[in-house]
């Protein structure tokens, strides 16, 4: 399974892996899995990032429409990816690709 491989290799993950994972399992699940693997609670992540817990929950659930706007969403995702030690640029890129795919369906 992708998650098992990712989980085992998390400490040594390279940017290629984070991009591949974000595209395979989705940005929401990638961020959640990374947070859990680093043993942070959602509350701790929200407190550290200075972002309301409800917004991080929305990101982890893929409910981007509950966020205050596209600019905020990209910044929240970028900061969250940095926080969990993923390549932020690639995670944001995967998010934009997800959104584009949703809009064309």
Spans of features found by a protein language model:
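Low-complexity alpha-helical segments at protein termini and membrane interfaces
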Residues: 1-37, 43-47, 82-105
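Short acidic alpha-helix initiation/capping motifs at coil-to-helix transition points
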Residues: 35-36, 69-75
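Positions that flank functional sites
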Residues: 50, 61, 96
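Recognition helix of helix-turn-helix/homeodomain-like DNA-binding domains
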Residues: 53-70
């Amino acid at each position: 399974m992708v998650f098992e491989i990712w989980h085992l290799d998390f400490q040594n993950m390279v940017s290629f892996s984070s991009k591949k994972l974000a595209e395979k399992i989705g940005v929401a699940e990638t961020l959640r899995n990374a947070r859990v693997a680093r043993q942070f609670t959602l509350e701790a992540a929200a407190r550290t990032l200075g972002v309301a817990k409800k917004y991080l929950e929305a990101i982890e659930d893929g409910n981007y429409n509950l966020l205050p706007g596209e600019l905020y969403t990209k910044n929240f995702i970028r900061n969250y990816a940095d926080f969990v030690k993923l390549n932020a640029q690639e995670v944001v890129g995967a998010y934009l690709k997800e959104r584009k795919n949703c809009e064309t369906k």
